Amino acid sequence: MNLFTDIRTLVIDSLAAMTAEGALPEGLDFANVTVEPPRDAAHGDMATNAAMVLAKPAKMKPRDIAEALAAKLAQDKRITSAEVAGPGFLNLRLDLSVWQDVLGKALNAEEAYGRSDMGQGKRVNVEYVSANPTGPLHVGHTRGAVFGDALASLLDFAGYDVTREYYINDGGAQVDVLARSAYLRYLEAHGQSVEFPDGTYPGEYLKDVGAALKDKFGDRFVGQPEETWLEEVRNFATDMMMDLIREDLALLGVEMDVFYSEKSLYGTGRIEAALESLDAKGLIYEGVLEPPKGKKPDDWEPRIQTLFKSTEHGDDVDRPVKKSDGAWTYFAPDIAYHYDKVSRGFDMLIDIFGADHGGYVKRMKAAVSALSDGKVPLDVKLCQLVKLFKDGQEFKMSKRAGTFVTLRDVVDAVGADVTRFMLLTRKNDQGFDFDLDKALEQSKDNPVFYVQYANARIHSTLRKAREAGIACDEATLSGADLSLLTHDAQLAVARKVAEWPRQVEIAARTNEPHRIAFFLYELASDLHGLYHLGKSEESLRFVNESSELATHANLALARAVSIVISAGLGILGVKPAQEM
């Protein structure tokens, strides 16, 4: 269904024929031959680099290869012209029937149009959000949640078997801090005046936890030493925070398949098993690391520690996994967690971290490479910071959270759909200034409005056509005479529809769902342009009062656009608007 793949296959077959005829030497590798849209649409519909990449290994001039390939391609009825440009690029123009055929396939496939078998059912684990269970999700978590969820949906659309996973960081010191903070709110619920020391969590959201602790335990823990209440309060508060986090995720339409507890790794032999696996490969040793330059990391000490030879798998330095006092480092449970992922049989792992975890990437990749003997790739995506603006001012704090803007604040301000789309209009590793006022503007400068308005405009046109007695059911539109679509503006839209399967595969191959948002904006722009041309040219109007056949063809084109927009928005986790 990917037209660009079809034409690339034609190019490869033509090169193979040239080889058989002696026009090219034997043994050439065609893997780097591409077929893509040209940078300038005036140059044609597609362009191939075949002559440029084959010239050196073939020991031939690129133009000679390009001219011979052009003659071969011109024999195919789908190619109306093949022109050599510059040093040896080949620009192709396709017969109009090709674009019309693509529209027919889109109409018949409906929202399955663009789905790919690229993933071949390979199992992918996408871990995202994984926020500490110490409070509500903030705007940084929101970006990670949106990015991870859209990426998971994209990979599913591209034929992968995807598991969405959240790692609960409930095994470290931060949940002890949560417990102590919740205990203070518990005392407050009993009427005591409390002060929050530095390092505790002062947010008002813990008042609910304090009240719930009072309801469950009464005054049992009042005035008692920490060792009598820490574990129970910690477990209770962590569970309540995870309930809050699940509610926050639900506001964005994010549903996880797996919630994996860090705590489950301790005392179960899982950390030991992971390190034994590395030890069996000669990758664990006792030693003292050289002191690092600059700021010393938390896990460095000038004594003998248990170390992982991560440098043998691409890391800059070897990493401690057990301290000199026998305690695990932060890295040890992370190794065990990824060992568990590898053991579950995933073919590919994707971790989505905040930008502040950039220094963790190499060691994590080294661990997965070592644990899987290089068979399971790990891709780590970093999400840069988001700054919120409202009324021209940076929006910095939530009263309930105390120190940060929450996910709930953002969704309350602009809605889940707008939040999701807007956060996907920038690549994940770029900082993003999110203007809440502009996100609600009804203008071309607001991408989510512009795309949604295109879809709503199409549905409005179809409704009005039905009300006027014009048949525009799926069967009628699928059977429309698409050969009537010959205007440049119509063909520009058709070409964009044809590019959709290619965009899906590129976005999935690079793990970049923002490409989908960009593409939808471009498609919407072409649709709006065609609509406005119809105001002055009757033949381009979606409803052409002079020709029922032209009306059906135009409505079929519009319907194909709606199919792509709906599928694309579905990948982004945004509900397509049918009216605005």
UniProtKB/Swiss-Prot annotation:
Keyword match Ligase: yes
Domain of life: Bacteria
GO cellular component, one term: cytoplasm
Enzyme class: ligase
UniProt-listed GO biological process terms: arginyl-tRNA aminoacylation
Family to which the UniProt record says this protein belongs: Belongs to the class-I aminoacyl-tRNA synthetase family.
Name of the protein: Arginine--tRNA ligase
Source organism of this protein record: Ruegeria sp. (strain TM1040)
